[in-house]
Amino acid sequence: MVKNSSVRTRKRVKKQITDGIAHIHASFNNTIVTITDRQGNALGWATSGGSGFRGSRKSTPFAAQIAAERCAEIVKDYGIKNLEVMVKGPGPGRESTIRALNAAGFRITNITDVTPIPHNGCRPPKKRRV
């Protein structure tokens, strides 16, 4: 007779981290918020589109604020208190995301703009004629 042995998976222990980095990618169409530790390992992320906004509502500052609140909710178990913010892109969700992270209880120590600027690299897209 074979005994039924239950397979136990080890419960993942969330390590306590005090300092983190918030990467905000604010494009014209969407806003992506990722919170990592100092080494760059992602702890949690959220997007405007994943927060229930679709189409042109994805690219609003309010959608970026909701995405930042959801990301803060995901990583609060890690015990992060201080955040360094890296903002990339020209989108409308740049400032509202930082305000939402501040309101979520994080102490923002540093804000850095890491938007890539070409030294006359690729040709930009043609201007829209509407």
Curated annotation (Swiss-Prot):
UniProt xrefs under Pfam families: Ribosomal_S11
GO-annotated molecular function: rRNA binding; structural constituent of ribosome
Entries under InterPro entries matching the protein: Ribosomal_uS11, Ribosomal_uS11_bac-type, Ribosomal_uS11_CS, Ribosomal_uS11_sf
GO cellular component, one term: ribonucleoprotein complex
Keywords from the UniProt entry: Ribonucleoprotein, Ribosomal protein, RNA-binding, rRNA-binding
GO biological process, one term: translation
Record keyword rRNA-binding present: yes
Function text: Located on the platform of the 30S subunit, it bridges several disparate RNA helices of the 16S rRNA. Forms part of the Shine-Dalgarno cleft in the 70S ribosome.
Family: Belongs to the universal ribosomal protein uS11 family.
PANTHER family: 40S RIBOSOMAL PROTEIN S14/30S RIBOSOMAL PROTEIN S11
Complexes and interactors: Part of the 30S ribosomal subunit. Interacts with proteins S7 and S18. Binds to IF-3.
Protein name from the UniProt record: Small ribosomal subunit protein uS11
